[in-house]
Amino acid sequence: SAASDVYKRQVYATQDGTFSAVLFDGPYKLVTKDKNGPWVNNRDTIYVEVKGKTQCEVKVTPYFTISDENITLDNNIVSGTCNIQQIVQDAKISQAMLLVSKTTFVDENTNIARQNLSNINPGVTNISLDITSNQNVQSAKALFARIGVKANGADQAVYSEIFRLK
């Protein structure tokens, strides 16, 4: 179809990587953002023909993944452990972070407490954070935490599942 027949609309991925949009039937062009995300940069254009409920997958290759994660709260110490797997052979870890928030929306930019680790390698990683003197954390009715891992050169981290601490 001609370029003028293609509809344009911005769509944003959620924290779990999914995205959705309510669209009319017709041709669409999905253009990924350049140098965005915790994965190998691969600017791409995907043409999608929407007819009713339509699914579209955008495949990416993360620099790292996180597995076997666990986060606990005991005596004002938040302790996290995970296994960081290296997916891209020459990727290096910029930092790992333990992030705490009052809501399930917790990431590098949205948190009320954090502990960063640098100079780490893939494999089992332990990270802890003393929240004794953090009034924001102490006064929170609910606490959630997750671990993030950011690769050198990436603008975002890859994240673990979210754990409810209280």
Q: Where do the language-model regions lie?
A:
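A glycine-anchored, Pro-Gly-centered beta-turn/N-cap motif
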Residues: 24-27, 123, 141
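Short beta-strand segments within Ig-like beta-sandwich modules, predominantly Fibronectin type-III
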Residues: 9-14
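Solvent-exposed loop/turn segments flanking beta-strands in beta-repeat/beta-sandwich domains
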Residues: 1, 87-110
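Short, small-residue-biased leader/transition segments that mark boundaries at the very start
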Residues: 2-7
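Structured interaction patches on ligand/partner-binding surfaces of diverse proteins
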Residues: 35-61
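Short edge beta-strand/loop segments characteristic of extracellular beta-sandwich folds
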Residues: 79-87
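Beta-strand-rich modules
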Residues: 134-156
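A short, solvent-exposed beta-strand micro-motif common in secreted/extracellular proteins
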Residues: 17, 23-38
